[in-house]
A protein has these predicted regions:
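A short, internal acetyl-CoA/4′-phosphopantetheine-binding micro-motif in the GNAT/acyltransferase core
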Residues: 65-71
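Active-site core of bacterial EAL-family cyclic-dinucleotide phosphodiesterase domains
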Residues: 3-65
């Protein structure tokens, strides 16, 4: 495994045991044919902390590492919980608001 992958994996492990610090869930709006928001897609992002500052790591890099290390299970649970909280909040304003979540094969 390359030095970069090892560095990212170490940061992912650290983030997972430190209350998912560095992980953020972003939401891409889903619109109906009249351009009204009816839902959102939950998108996981990861920011790796270093001496040079925070670096956003592409999901193309970090998702396979989460899957290979099986950290995807607790991180996936984190995403589900965050998305459910946001969905409940949004349902106060949009009754049938829904959130789409991509899940891992793991």
């Amino acid at each position: 495994m390359s030095l970069r992958k090892n560095t990212i994996l170490s940061a992912l492990r650290s983030a997972t045991v430190n209350d998912f610090e560095g992980f953020e869930v972003y939401y891409q709006p889903i619109l109906d044919s009249a351009d009204r928001i009816i839902g959102a897609e939950a998108l996981l992002r990861f920011f790796m902390h270093s001496d040079e500052g925070d670096e956003m790591i592409s999901p193309v890099e970090f998702i396979p590492l989460l899957e290979k290390s099986r950290l995807i299970i607790p991180v996936g649970e984190f995403v589900l919980n965050e998305a459910a909280k946001m969905c409940r909040e949004m349902q106060q304003y949009i009754a049938d608001f829904r959130v789409n979540i991509n899940v891992s094969y793991i």
